Amino acid sequence: MIERWLYSTNAKDIAVLYFIFAIFCGMAGTAMSLIIRLELAAPGNQVLSGNHQLFNVLVVGHAVLIIFFLVMPALIGGFGNYMLPLLIGASDMSFARLNNISFWCLPPALVCLVTSTLVESGAGTGWTVYPPLSSIQAHSGPSVDLAIFALHLTSISSLLGAINFIVTTLNMRTNGMTMHRLPLFVWSIFITAFLLLLSLPVLSAGVTMLLLDRNFNTSFFEVAGGGDPVLYQHLFWFFGHPEVYILIIPGFGIISHIVSTYSKKPVFGEVSMVYAMASIGLLGFLVWSHHMYIVGLDADTRAYFTSATMIIAIPTGIKIFSWLATIYGGSIRLAVPMLYAIAFLFLFTIGGLTGVALANASLDVAFHDTYYVVGHFHYVLSMGAIFSLFAGYYYWSPQILGLYYNEKLAQIQFWLIFVGANVIFLPMHFLGVNGMPRRIPDYPDAFAGWNYVASIGSIIAVFSLFLFIYILYDQLVNGLENKVNNKSVIYNKGPDFVESNQIFATNKIKSSSIEFLLTSPPAVHTFNTPAVQS
């Protein structure tokens, strides 16, 4: 047991560890968001007894837990580690032991984060950790230092993982698997790994300077010593903007597979999809200052960042329309993964549209730090990254676990979270247009109506998550066994396959990617002899 799970060098076992960790942290992060919404359900003090510092600590905890401890471990560490070697026909990840330490950096990081909330009065800085609020004058205890250590540990984890994914993809593809034949999910993880590799060192530099400012009397961000807090913002957002693409691009890969499978068609414009993802990744590094329109940038700088930000809409639009073209004329089956994929397309597009409004420097002066921004990025993250997470789970878990989930319960869970998430985040745009500021635990009575609606929505969404945990339990305990490989023919809940640009065939089934040709669940060691493309 200890040998298998603690010292594991098996990508599949490490992926399972990532999933368990991510589910645990996701529940904690969701609990924090529920407390935030309960506090904001009505004007005045509701649940936090006027402790406004605690409110901000919850905001930090919610953000960091969900970004660094749920979405990245699940999409990249979980699906990436499990599916990428299967999809390229590799026996494991290139650096198997490095993979192990990538995971085991995360539990200590979680310990640091939790500890930071328990000492003094916690780190109430917002997830951006801007000085001077995060400096030693405003946050005197070790809270912020512990939060910085947590970020360092997650950065190490992600960096090592990124190196591992890049080397594995370049060196361990099976015979006949050229780069142009890689499945889209592999491409998405590959591109994400490059984004991590280039952006995380900048974050680490920024928070290390903050650590030195706080403890060793340097003045990187200390105006009295000739420093500038705006430097920190540049460093943070040079990481922070690629980070949001790191969160969503693996989701793009998952959605591509699902849309293709349940439309019984190859993805429309597969190579264009790869170039679109790569363009999004590259452009993501050229737009960071659109988070900083109000710090006093020159007019020409603002003009550039406005234009560059809008250009990202082009490759994103290519992806959306290619997915629609894949669905169009297909033989669509609305299984749960497909429901999530279609919801993803609709809601991600809405999130993108509100983003176009925020891209304008002049408009953003009004929108900055209001709930309009919160509504925008939760549409693209909550209904982009999290929906693709659920979609990937419902798509691949019967193959990974060898057990089916209850389709009817899963559909109910989808509709609950679909309704809940929209009821939470749509009203936030209305609040933001009317000027309700972010990160504030109380508000004038005029904002009460929509805040109450949003809080009702969060209760619906939390119910859907409880239902998901039950579905998971039911699948593991009572799930129907996935005995044979031609299940997609005899059992209507499995995916339908179709001839794609590349065909992997056994005598039972043809598939557009390798993973469904293996036994279910896959053997502990797959591809000891290389898979050869037919």
UniProtKB/Swiss-Prot annotation:
GO molecular function: cytochrome-c oxidase activity; heme binding; metal ion binding
Xref: CDD domains: Cyt_c_Oxidase_I
Keyword Transport on entry: yes
Keywords: Calcium, Copper, Electron transport, Heme, Iron, Magnesium, Membrane, Metal-binding, Mitochondrion, Mitochondrion inner membrane, Respiratory chain, Translocase, Transmembrane, Transmembrane helix, Transport
Annotated O2 binding sites: 245
Cofactor note text: Binds 2 heme A groups non-covalently per subunit. Binds a copper B center.
SUPFAM superfamilies recorded: Cytochrome c oxidase subunit I-like
Binding-site residues, Cu cation: 241, 290-291
InterPro entries referenced in this protein's UniProt entry, alphabetically: Cyt_c_oxase-like_su1_dom, Cyt_c_oxase-like_su1_sf, Cyt_C_Oxase_1, Cyt_c_Oxase_su1_BS, Cyt_c_oxase_su1_dom
Positions bound to Ca(2+): 39, 42, 44, 441
EC code: 7.1.1.9
EC primary class: translocase
Residues reported in the UniProt entry to bind Mg(2+): 368-369
Function: Component of the cytochrome c oxidase, the last enzyme in the mitochondrial electron transport chain which drives oxidative phosphorylation. The respiratory chain contains 3 multisubunit complexes succinate dehydrogenase (complex II, CII), ubiquinol-cytochrome c oxidoreductase (cytochrome b-c1 complex, complex III, CIII) and cytochrome c oxidase (complex IV, CIV), that cooperate to transfer electrons derived from NADH and succinate to molecular oxygen, creating an electrochemical gradient over the inner membrane that drives transmembrane transport and the ATP synthase.
Similarity field: Belongs to the heme-copper respiratory oxidase family.
Name of this chain's protein: Cytochrome c oxidase subunit 1
Species this chain originates from: Kluyveromyces lactis (strain ATCC 8585 / CBS 2359 / DSM 70799 / NBRC 1267 / NRRL Y-1140 / WM37) (Yeast)
Gene: COX1
